[in-house]
Amino acid sequence: MQFIDQARITVRAGRGGDGIMAFRREKYVPAGGPSGGDGGEGGNVVLEADGNLQTLLDFKYNRLFPAPDGRRGGPNRCTGASGKDLIIKVPCGTEVRHLSTGILLGDLTRSDDLLVVAFGGRGGLGNAHYLSNRNRAPEKFTEGRDGEEWFLQLELKLLAEVGIIGLPNAGKSTLISVLSAARPKIADYPFTTLVPNLGVVRRPSGDGTVFADIPGLIAGAAQGAGLGHDFLRHIERTRLLIHVLDGGAEDPVEDLLVVEKELVAYGHDLVERPRLLVLNKQELLDEQHQDQLVDALQAASGRRLILISAAMGLGLEGLLAQVWKELGV
């Protein structure tokens, strides 16, 4: 399934039904008064979070969402039927903004969360409303009002507690695949991961924690280079970051600084987020080189380094122990 995490849509609430002019015409009521009914309310447009959806793909080709109009009033003071609300399902984690102003309308984070994004127009008044002592046969009635119409920006931000970040080919996808049941595409070339991958990792209690493997960052990602800018938003909600470094890279210290710089440039307090620093592909390092690299990385980052080999399953228990400690579980 194609992963789409941004969409622009138009929502149009229903127009209110018109009021009408009518008079009582019973056989034994020769001077029947006004009886025109009111129009029904226009339908609202409502977004609803659905935990079964993972992408905004449904909005790629369908971008106009009109709610039904209210019906016109009837005689005998009958009010017209109101238009039914239009319910639009979106994934949990969807932010909704006005396209023109960028104003945040709502953030649908839990399944069944509801957000009214366009209100239906009010129904018009029938002539029965205008009966008075001075006017016993009013002919005045009003039309229904138009419903609201808005252009909206939908933005999906994944709901994961732990985000796995790093440069391309650092082994992030391999790591999430061995920690969870996720099966991302894995190969030995950059940008194998083109979309975020989610995996559920079991806590000691048996409960699940969602990990997200974010496509590799490169220098300039926060300004839109590579794939990073499109997907950095998906770690905004995380409680903990795991920064994976490639032990077989030419200069892991420089790689560390590149990602650190991108987190600072992107903002949203990502650089302040609790973070574990992980050196992957431990099996590629001899003991002397490993010791030197550990010292250099810890000095450059001010963090304790965790050594692992995701491919060989080394150091994973220690890594998870640190994750649970940071999350307080």
Curated annotation (Swiss-Prot):
The keyword Membrane does not apply. ATP binds at residues 166-173, 191-195, 213-216, 280-283, 309-311. Its EC number is 3.6.5.-. It comes from Prochlorococcus marinus (strain MIT 9303). Keywords: ATP-binding, Cytoplasm, GTP-binding, Hydrolase, Magnesium, Metal-binding, Nucleotide-binding. Belongs to the TRAFAC class OBG-HflX-like GTPase superfamily. OBG GTPase family. Its cofactor is Mg(2+). The keyword RNA-binding does not apply. Its main location: cytoplasm. Monomer. GO terms for cellular component: cytoplasm. Signal peptide: none annotated. It is found in: Cytoplasm. An essential GTPase which binds GTP, GDP and possibly (p)ppGpp with moderate affinity, with high nucleotide exchange rates and a fairly low GTP hydrolysis rate. Plays a role in control of the cell cycle, stress response, ribosome biogenesis and in those bacteria that undergo differentiation, in morphogenesis control. Mg(2+) binds at residues 173, 193. GO terms for molecular function: ATP binding; GTP binding; GTPase activity; magnesium ion binding. It holds the Pfam family MMR_HSR1. The lineage of its organism: Bacteria, Bacillati, Cyanobacteriota, Cyanophyceae, Synechococcales. InterPro entries: G_OBG (IPR031167), GTP-bd (IPR006073), GTP-bd_Obg/CgtA (IPR014100), GTP1_OBG_dom (IPR006169), GTP1_OBG_dom_sf (IPR036726), OBG_GTPase (IPR045086), P-loop_NTPase (IPR027417). This is GTPase Obg. HAMAP family: GTPase_Obg (MF_01454). GO terms for biological process: ribosome biogenesis. Residues 1-159 form the Obg domain. CDD domains: Obg. Residues 160-328 form the OBG-type G domain.
